[in-house]
Amino acid sequence: MAHKKAGGSTRNGRDSESKRLGVKRFGGEAVLAGSIIVRQRGTKFHAGIDVGCGKDHTLFALKDGKVKFEVKGPKNRKFISIEAE
C-alpha cells in the first residue's frame, strides 16, 4: 500500500496587495484639472504651480495644461507644476 501521510501546512505564502504607486502622467503630457499625476507615500515629489496635494500625498492637477517636472531649492527638491497650454 503506497500511501503518504499528509504533510504539515506552511506558515509562509502571504504578501500584501500592491498599492499601484508611482508617476501616472509624465513630463510634457497634457492633463485635465483633477487628473492624478503621482501617487506616492510621503512627499518624494512636491506640489508646484497649479498642482494640489491630497491627504495621502497624491499630487493632482488643479488646471488643464502640461505636466512639468523641475528640481528647485537648496535641498534639490523635485516639484511638479502645470504649464498652461
UniProtKB/Swiss-Prot annotation:
Region (Disordered): 1-20
SUPFAM superfamilies for the chain: Ribosomal L27 protein-like
InterPro entries the UniProt entry points to: Ribosomal_bL27, Ribosomal_bL27_CS
Listed GO MF terms: structural constituent of ribosome
Domain of life where this protein originates: Bacteria
UniProt keyword list: Ribonucleoprotein, Ribosomal protein
Coiled-coil blocks: none
GO process terms (BP): translation
Pfam families: Ribosomal_L27 (PF01016)
Family per record: Belongs to the bacterial ribosomal protein bL27 family.
Protein name: Large ribosomal subunit protein bL27
High-level lineage: Bacteria, Pseudomonadati, Pseudomonadota, Gammaproteobacteria, Enterobacterales
